[in-house]
A protein has these predicted regions:
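Long, contiguous binding/interaction regions
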Residues: 1-89
Length: 89
């Protein structure tokens, strides 16, 4: 199966959604290369970047589930790098 490298940018405006967001990220953890979170306390938001190497349908599913959480928005950016699952580039 082909995989793509992608970045999901997440903004959390409702802290009560944090547990559900972390559960989703844990569910897709085998595809996650890394993540970085920045609390912006002055504005009361948290900004999270998640980098994945996964089949495109898995990336889209995760992004969609994240975007449906209350007070959470997500945007996905895909690289042009496509490889077969298990292949090292």
């Amino acid at each position: 199966m082909e995989t793509r490298v992608a970045l999901i940018g997440i903004i959390v405006e409702q802290e009560s959604s944090a547990a559900a967001l972390n559960a989703l990220l844990h569910e897709y953890g085998s595809y996650i290369i890394g993540r970085m979170g920045l609390p912006y306390r002055e504005r009361g938001v948290n900004i999270i970047s998640v980098v994945l190497d996964a089949p495109q349908d898995k990336i889209a599913a995760l992004s969609g589930k994240i975007g449906r959480l209350p007070g959470v928005s997500a945007k996905t950016q895909y690289s042009n790098v496509i490889s077969r699952e298990g292949e090292n580039q």
